[in-house]
Amino acid sequence: LYACNERIMSDRDELIVGVLNLAKASDAVLLAGNLIDNAKAQAEADVEVKAAAAEADFRRINGLGPKDRIPPKLRGAYNAIAKKDELKRQATRLTRDVLDRALNSVASIYRDVAVLQNNAEDAVGLINLENRSSIAELSVRLDRAAAVRRLEDIATARRRLNGNGNPTLVFEALFCALIP
């Protein structure tokens, strides 16, 4: 997914750097806001692309061109494709997926910290190689218990998100907990 979508990769890189640069609660709140906004925008864009593709498929299957009027007999089925309620539900689901992916990205930072703390880089390598120096600094500042505690904080955030917690509050709380 990251390899084929430049924006998703850019958002991930921005998130990783943002987490590594957390220094105060205001940083955490701003980072959470940016993450939520990016997740919603990404989800809405994906839903629009899928809806447009579904409409094009519907027209093609029914022998209609892009500019042809939809016959009255087919309007109900055509309108069901792009119902606002359904699109909103899909966008919400996709937003949750994007946020879950963000949690995986944040967890990868602390996985890399643990790898460096345990001198296992040669054996398993780092996920976030482009941020190696910042992760190395973080691995020195945190003890092993603190790194594990942050992974537990990420798991707690995931449970809260899966339990329909407010995404903004979940990520603000998480990012505040991650401040070294």
Place the predicted regions along the sequence by residue:
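Charged, glycine-rich active-site and insertion segments that engage polyanionic ligands
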Residues: L1-S105, V115-P180
